[in-house]
Amino acid sequence: MSLVVGQSLGLTLVGDGLSLRNSKINVGKSKFFSVNRRRLARAALVQARPKEDGAAASPSPSSRPASVVQYRRADLADDLQAEARALGRAIDASIYSPELIARKHGSQPFKALRRSLEILGALGGFALKLGIDQKQGNLEKNMKKRAIELRRIFTRLGPTFVKLGQGLSTRPDLCPPDYLEELAELQDALPTFPDAEAFACIERELDLSLETIFSSVSPEPIAAASLGQVYKAQLRYSGQVVAVKVQRPGIEEAIGLDFYLIRGVGKLINKYVDFITTDVLTLIDEFACRVYQELNYVQEAQNARRFKKLYADKADVLVPDIFWDYTSRKVLTMEWVEGTKLNEQLAIESQGLKVLDLVNTGIQCSLRQLLEYGFFHADPHPGNLLATPDGKLAFLDFGMMSETPEEARFAIIGHVVHLVNRDYEAMARDYYALKFLSPDVDVTPIIPALRDFFDDALNYTVSELNFKTLVDGLGAVFYQYPFNVPPYYALILRSLTVLEGLALYADPNFKVLAASYPYFAKRLLTDPNPYLRDALIELLFKDGKFRWNRLENLLQQGSKDRDFSAKDALQPVLKLLLDPNGEELRLLVIKEAVRVSEAIALGTVVDTYNSLPEFLRSLVFNGNGNGPLTMSTAELQSTLELRDQVSRIWGLLQSSESFDPAILQPILQVLQQPEARRLGGRVAGGVGQRLAARFLQQLLRATTPSSAPSP
């Protein structure tokens, strides 16, 4: 659930099928605010401050009107104390435990039976239709229709099944593409609960009257979703405008009962359904654990704080502050963000902003989340990504977060390298490192399936390849074979697919892979991690030959990334070359350095030859007016292209904003090392031998000119 002030409707809350209202009242005049005088008398006015590691406040024009009284940011110690108090209020927050929910709901058989009949009544008819389709051979024909029916059934069954369907929409190893597409459309769409209950919950959770905390609050929720609803309010002590999210009464009880029943179905599937190879019970428990974390709003606040610390250093990214002293396990108070949904193209463009710029910011931030720090926003739907009036991209709603293990981050980048190289055997082996397959699974049958799909997909260039097409194709492979896609990877696919979908509103030709490639190129060129260094070597060398076109393309793409550094690109490569264990690579580099040096020298000769008057060419080059070298036309063109390619690569390095001749100083220091001097000597020796051979050929051509082909 997320907040935004819409450009056309006034106050708008964006999210999953949320209701819209825009009225406001004074707290003191509302019939809902019954002030507990005894509690008010003993309660001091709490000076809640957002957490920001002690940095000075930097009010955002998009979220802090000039009329708002600016608050003084607390120092780190006070801030940690405020967070500790919030944690204390959440000390009794429930943690998902299959044993505890079984003990609790197993002792309430009539309640469990009533809900079971409700679920069976909804899903039983659907299962019967599937059985008839299978018997009549109409499964494929009716798949889209059945997927729509399942989405509607999940919506009717309430929050747990809406969340379950959203989770299934990220699992290509469990659901066919038609079901993935339909379940991804599931939206939270529950009616609001009474405002009196919400206000009572705030007072109960924070142990303060509303009048003490707020000077005004909307009398009705700005939005309502499955787990809670949100009010817009103004803090009394500072005038700060905030969003206050209040948890739906009884939601934890309802979700616990549903997961108790769903686990029972999972046990039956694991025991009796052979064609589903995934451990369904483990999958259910992982998902239930994630939903229970969303029920703890202090956990969500900590997620927001961590996210802000990692990613809000960029000028074009906004993460709202948390007000810890007004936050508990059922109440979350955070900075109000004004903005426009990212799929409202006309509203965004009317402010002089470009949707594609904002989406590209989202893609670059998401790539950093997924592959640098590993802590990422797992629910980037349009309501959680807002365009602020000053052009920033605001991230909201941090209930659903996930983490990418460090080894998986590098494995994903390596997987991209294997894809570019069309090395399908290596791609299949990557699935072990990514934990998609258990070590005892033979990947041999999977390789042809990867080849069949990607050979067709890679007929397009990276800039032409549609990410959703790629995901759908991979999903078909995952569905056919015994894959168990980890939750983090499924959420990665969903995040990037959503971002590409948002971009397609503005530009039907936009491709998220093309926008992502500069980041991958920069990481390959600059990251000193040994795994990525090996991946770079694998990308650039083939059959003992260096692929200069690959390096040129990487530099072209990497230089588009705002964080690209020529210094970072040069030094790790040199260190790799001079590593005591790098003899095999040095042999390849020596061979290539000889080729390049020869190409530069011979290119200079050709340029000199071409600049001479025609009568001098015959005099200088042994009476031959057709060319200076004993080389075929194809060989000469290849040599000159190599020289020009190296020249362009050097130009790309020089054009980097971070390029400074001073970066060569540490490189020269590296070259003073004994191994570097030996390497240089071997290169010089190789160049000398090649040029001597060329010179000897030239002399022989002078005595037997007919034996040498004309260039």
Curated annotation (Swiss-Prot):
Q: Where is the transit peptide?
A: 1-42
Keywords, ordered alphabetically:
ATP-binding, Chloroplast, Kinase, Nucleotide-binding, Plastid, Stress response, Transferase, Transit peptide
Annotated ATP binding lies at: I222, A223, A224, A225, S226, L227, G228, Q229, V230, K245
The terms describing its cellular component in GO are: chloroplast; mitochondrion; plastoglobule
Which residues act catalytically here? D379 (proton acceptor)
Effect listed in the UniProt record for changing A301V: In rbd1-3; suppression of bdr1-1 and bdr1-2 bleaching and dwarf phenotypes
What Pfam family is a match for this entry?
A: ABC1
- Provide the Protein kinase domain boundaries: 216-546
Judging by the UniProt lineage, the source's domain of life is Eukaryota
Catalyzed reactions per annotation: L-seryl-[protein] + ATP = O-phospho-L-seryl-[protein] + ADP + H(+); L-threonyl-[protein] + ATP = O-phospho-L-threonyl-[protein] + ADP + H(+)
Q: Which CDD domains match?
A: ABC1_ADCK3-like
Per UniProt, what does mutating G167D do? In rbd1-6; suppression of bdr1-1 and bdr1-2 bleaching and dwarf phenotypes
Q: What is this protein called?
A: Protein ACTIVITY OF BC1 COMPLEX KINASE 3, chloroplastic
Q: Which organism is it from?
A: Arabidopsis thaliana (Mouse-ear cress)
